[in-house]
Amino acid sequence: MNLTNIPRQALPELLCRMPKAELHIHIEGSLEPELIFALAERNRLQLAYPTIESLRAAYAFTNLQSFLDIYYAGASVLQTEQDFFDMAWAYLLRAKADNVVHAEIFFDPQTHTARGIPFATIINGLDRAIQQGRNELGISAALILCFLRHLTEADAFTVLEEALPFRDKFIGVGLDSGEKGNPPEKFSRVFARCRELGLRLVAHAGEEGTAEYIWHALDLLQAERIDHGVHCLDDPQLVTRLVQQQVPLTVCPLSNVKLRVFPDLAAHNIARLLACGIRATINSDDPAYFGGYLNQNYLETFAALPELGAAEAYQLARNSFEASFVDAEVKAGWIRELDQFFQQQCDKI
C-alpha cells in the first residue's frame, strides 16, 4: 500500500471519511451555546449572557484558566439525568458524522457533585447515551472519570468512593483542569488505589506544564496514556522513553492554538512527534469551545502543515485505535477496516 501516491488534494475527503477513534474529549466541553440555552430554559435557570451570540462571544479566552472559568459556568446548566443524556447524545451524533467508530469520553463529576448533583444522575445519563449510541448509531464509546487537579486528593478519593457502585459504567480515571501548581504527584495515592481496582489510568501533562510533569505522570501515577504531552520534545530522554515504550499522546491541535500553547497551527509539533516515532493521536478536547470537532482538527492541522500527507493520516488513525483501551481483537478489526479504506484510496489512483 503506497500511500505517497495519494495526492494532496485528496486529503480533505480522506481525512473526513477514514475510520478513527477519539481519545481526548471532555463531554462538558462539547456543550454548544444552543444546548446551554435550551437546558437553562428547561431548568428555569438565569444565564449571565442574554443571547446565544453573547455567550459565544465570551469564548474568546486567552489561556487555560480563563477557558476553565467559562467551562465550569456552562456546565452549571446540567441538572437532570436527561440533561447529561442530551449532552452526550449530541456529541455522539457529531462523532458519528466524523466517522468516529470509538470514543473514550472524559467526564468531570466533581464539577457537578459540588453543585449538589448526585453522581448517579451524572453517570446514568451519560451511560444511557452511550448504550443508545451503540444500538442506534453503531458507535462504540466508554467513559473515563477525571479528577480535577485544582481540588484536593481527598476530594478525588471522595468522588472515587461515590463512583464505585457504578464501576461497570466507566473504564478508567484521568486527571484534568489547571496544571500550574497542581503536579501529578499531588494525586499519587488516589491513582495507586485506582490501579488496585483495575482501572485504566491516563493524565493530562505537558500542556501548560513542563516535560517534568510527563515524567511524573508516568512514574508517580503510572499513567498508561498522556493527554496533550506536547512539551515532551523539550526533553530528548523523555522522547526516547515515549518511543521505546510506545506511550500514546492524545494531542489536541485546535485546543493548543486557542490556549496559546502554540501561536498557530503552522507552529504545531504534531508532525515532529510522528517523525520521532511517538504514538501521537489527534483529538478535539473541548470542541464547542475550541472551534472544531475531530474532523475539523484533522482538516485544519493538515492544511497548516504541508509535511503531513496520507501516510501520516493513516498513522494517526491507526495510532488512535492502538492507543484505545479496547481488547486486542476489536482493535485488530478496526485496523483491518482502516487498511481496507486506505487500500481503496490507493486503488483509485
Swiss-Prot record:
Keyword Translocase: no
InterPro entries: A_deaminase_dom, ADE, Ado/ade_deaminase, Metal_Hydrolase
Protein's GO biological process: adenine catabolic process; hypoxanthine salvage; nucleotide metabolic process
Binding site for Zn(2+): H24, H26, H204, D285
Cofactors named for this entry: Zn(2+)
Enzyme Commission no: 3.5.4.2
Site feature Important for catalytic activity, where: H228
GO cellular component, one term: cytosol
Catalytic reaction equation(s): adenine + H2O + H(+) = hypoxanthine + NH4(+)
Active site: E207
Protein keywords: Hydrolase, Metal-binding, Nucleotide metabolism, Zinc
Superkingdom of the source species: Bacteria
MF annotations from Gene Ontology: adenine deaminase activity; zinc ion binding
Keyword Metal-binding: yes
Cofactor binding note: Binds 1 zinc ion per subunit.
Residues noted as binding substrate in the record, renumbered to the chain: D286
Family, similarity comment: Belongs to the metallo-dependent hydrolases superfamily. Adenosine and AMP deaminases family. Adenine deaminase type 2 subfamily.
Xref: HAMAP family: Adenine_deaminase (MF_01962)
Task of the protein: Catalyzes the hydrolytic deamination of adenine to hypoxanthine. Plays an important role in the purine salvage pathway and in nitrogen catabolism.
Name of the protein: Adenine deaminase
Organism: Trichlorobacter lovleyi (strain ATCC BAA-1151 / DSM 17278 / SZ) (Geobacter lovleyi)
